[in-house]
Amino acid sequence: MQRRIAFSLLLLLPFASPALADSACPDWTAQRAAAELAALAERLRQWDVAYHRDGRSPVADELYDQARARLADWNRCFPGQADASPEPLAGSAGPLLHPVPHTGLAKLDEAAVRDWMATREDLWTQPKVDGVAVTLEYADGRLRRAISRGDGRHGQDWTARVRRLPALPRQLAERRRLILQGELYWRLPGHVQAEAGGRSARARVAGLLARDTLDDGDAAGIGLFVWDWPNGPADMRARLDGLERLGFAEARRYSRPVADFATARQWRERWYREPLPFASDGVVLRQGRRPPGERWRAEPPHWAVAWKYPLAQALAEVRAVRFRIGRSGRITPQLELQPVRLDDRQIRRVALGSLRRWRELDVRPGDQVAIRLAGQSIPQVDAVVWRAAERPALPSPDPAAHHALSCWRPLPGCEEQFLARLDWLGGRRGLDLRGVGRGTWEALLENGRLDDLLGWLELDEARLAELPGFGERSASLLAERFRAARRRPFPMWLRALGLPPAGEATLPPSWDELAGRGPEQWQREPGIGPGRARQLQAFFAHPEVQALRQRLRAAGVEGF
């Protein structure tokens, strides 16, 4: 149905709330609020013009709806700086007056749908076809006018283009004046919305109809779903029967009576996950009987509502950008978000994958990003939807300063990678020190007990018990874990220190033998090429690694 009707390092922003959905407001000055509200209002205006006038869809419909709801929230938060909410259909009206206004639909969530259905009878549901709305006016059995939805009252003249569509009967048996409202959609045989999403089908139709000419191939790709007959029979069954006789059969095929909420939910789920010949973005619930067309207005009515499918993309506000640095020096930017719900999951953070990706997107606190769930329900950033009016400078780590042989000590700028080394060392693929995690290492580091990767070897129960946050029992358990680490076998220690992968190479139980190997000797081992051979030699030759070896040798650890 119609698109634009909606009710709906660490650097932190000064936001007090986890989400606007909780009715909290940004902690902005009046000047900042005015700038942010004006910027969003202008962005919405640009999107409206692109869609309704130019036939382009620069942003997904569900993101548009969320952006409009965000502006409404901000206007409520800052009434003194509120920007007049842009009329979605401003600039889209054409010269032709609709014989019956297009109403649009209120979009309800599950709880609101339950309440709406509870007070009504004779209810029906249809797929909410994802296309562009149109009025068709027939007289003497022939199409007299086709009018774009426009602002609901006036629209553009699409008659010449719509007459070329094979989806419309060329001649009707009915001679009297007929007024039909429906959706022009792009044909997608076997389309499963839950798997394929909208596939920009709506934008494709809008773009084609914005052209001056329409070729035969494109015309054949456009279908028609008539969803109402304003001057037709008062009864829904009679309207569906009449439309089928006139040659508009899809309405009957995809209209179902619903006696209760469970049935409505069942059809919504079915149409979301089963093949349909078109894209759809939810279902429409409507009363079988509604007021006659002459009483309709260009605003959401009380007799029909939309219940959208689960969001494929969520609009999320970036609260912070954190740069995670792994033990090998890989830098992974991570966005901290105001929590958003997507497919029944609450998303609080999302990784960007690489420093290059972050630089390409140039994401900063305050920006609004589109989030979707990728394979295995992993959240990912699709795009920056719009940028904050005020964008603070955001320093980032230097990639040249972080690599496989950097940050063996907690020097300035090395804290993150050093902690990652400790985390690996004590983890399951390292020394497997059960109960010793990142929090333990952070506590020891904050108390000045870790000058290098093996500083913990010197900590006994008495020294640990002196530290804030360590009781007698926890100190005893941790000291036992540290003592047990000394007894771990040589290969386990090599992995824990960060030995580059050695494939199927035979590793003698002696540090001296391994450290004495050159690249040529390493390449004689199965699975080791020139690059890996150089990495292995560099590891054993690095001064910090050699210093760790001396610590372990002095501690009596096997193999060193």
UniProtKB/Swiss-Prot annotation:
SUPFAM superfamilies: DNA ligase/mRNA capping enzyme, catalytic domain, Nucleic acid-binding proteins, RuvA domain 2-like. SMART domains: LIGANc (SM00532). It catalyses: NAD(+) + (deoxyribonucleotide)n-3'-hydroxyl + 5'-phospho-(deoxyribonucleotide)m = (deoxyribonucleotide)n+m + AMP + beta-nicotinamide D-nucleotide. Its EC number is 6.5.1.2. It holds the Pfam family HHH_5. Keywords: DNA damage, DNA repair, DNA replication, Ligase, NAD. One of its GO terms (biological process) is DNA repair. It comes from the Bacteria. InterPro entries: DNA_ligase_B (IPR020923), DNAligase_adenylation (IPR013839), DNAligase_N (IPR013840), NA-bd_OB-fold (IPR012340), NAD_dep_DNA_ligaseB (IPR050326), NAD_DNA_ligase_OB (IPR004150), RuvA_2-like (IPR010994). One of its GO terms (molecular function) is DNA ligase (NAD+) activity. The active site is at K128. Belongs to the NAD-dependent DNA ligase family. LigB subfamily. PANTHER family: DNA LIGASE, DNA LIGASE B. NCBIfam families: PRK08097.1. Catalyzes the formation of phosphodiester linkages between 5'-phosphoryl and 3'-hydroxyl groups in double-stranded DNA using NAD as a coenzyme and as the energy source for the reaction. This is DNA ligase B. The lineage of its organism: Bacteria, Pseudomonadati, Pseudomonadota, Gammaproteobacteria, Pseudomonadales.
